[in-house]
Amino acid sequence: MAKKPKVLVLFDVGEPTSLDDDYSEDLKSEDWKTERHVLNALKALGYPFAVLGVHNDTGLIADMIERFEPDVIFNMVEQFDSSLGNENRVTSFLELQGIPLTGCGSTGITLAKDKVISKKILSYHDINVPKFVVAAPGQLIELEEGMQFPLIVKPVREEASYGISLKSVVQNEAELVNRVCFVHERFKQEALVEEYVPGREVYVGVLGHDDLRCLPAREMTWRRDVPAEARFASYKVKWDEGYRQRWGIRNRFLPALDSLIQADLEATCSAVYRGLQLNGYAR
């Protein structure tokens, strides 16, 4: 019987680590449930594995690779040196090691995390995106021809809805200027200004490289009396449990759709996946 490949599991942590750190207590907490599930699955399937918490030292990763000699790296690192913007740099480093790894490659991560570049790429591939402009600090806000209020204002380089709230949706020029100035001052970066398109919040996981598989879609829902203009994934909607309970927000599997709509949803997700050069898995 062939030997099972050795798996090095990497995840990000908030402080410096060593090769021999013990994470058994951390893995008991709810915040570590993803890591716990992965390690439990590897154990149940009989894969030999080692774990390493990554903070800000790629040399430590190299040392663990030399010691453990993994056949594959299970990469769960989403930030480096406590910055989500550095995720692609860790993936680039891992790619240089020449060891197969899970998840998306560095090119796809870089393109997908840039809200402006990703929209330009999708437009090139004839995938509809809202009309948008970038408002840089110290410059006039010049809307594209045909852009109409309401608009939504976001930091260009943040993720996980950081910097997005109900105040991000603006109804007039005065509100637009105020929100753009807020983004400039608070986040020290450009503001993305785009048309606000009301609709449903749907998330689709996609797996694969050449042959893609769309996973069952998930939907974020609100209590019935919540107005339509408040139904979008702000930071509090995603991460503030008290806020979610107050507004009756929950995530569920998307109810069955008309077959044509379902096919269009999956085709669009697959086109986005390929257009942004994603691979492995993404959502």
Regions found by a protein language model. Give the residues of each.
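A long amphipathic alpha-helix within ATP-dependent nucleotide-binding catalytic cores
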Residues: 178, 182-190, 239-283
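A short glycine-rich, hydrophobically flanked beta-strand micro-motif that places a catalytic Asp/Glu
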Residues: 54, 191-195, 202-203, 277-283
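ATP-binding N-terminal substructure of ATP-dependent carboxylate-amine bond-forming enzymes
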Residues: 1-102, 106-107, 112-113, 124, ...
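Beta-strand scaffold of nucleotide-dependent catalytic cores
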Residues: 150-153, 179-180, 194, 201-237, ...
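A short, local hydrophobic-aromatic micro-motif
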Residues: 50, 102, 130-131, 215, ...
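Short small-residue beta-strand/loop micro-motif enriched in glycine and branched aliphatics
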Residues: 102-104, 160-163, 247
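Active-site nucleotide/adenylate-binding loops and adjacent lid/helix of ATP-dependent enzymes
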Residues: 4-11, 66-67, 109-192, 197-200, ...
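Short acidic/His/Gly/Ser-rich catalytic and metal-binding motifs that mark active-site loops
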Residues: 16-20, 159-161, 242-245
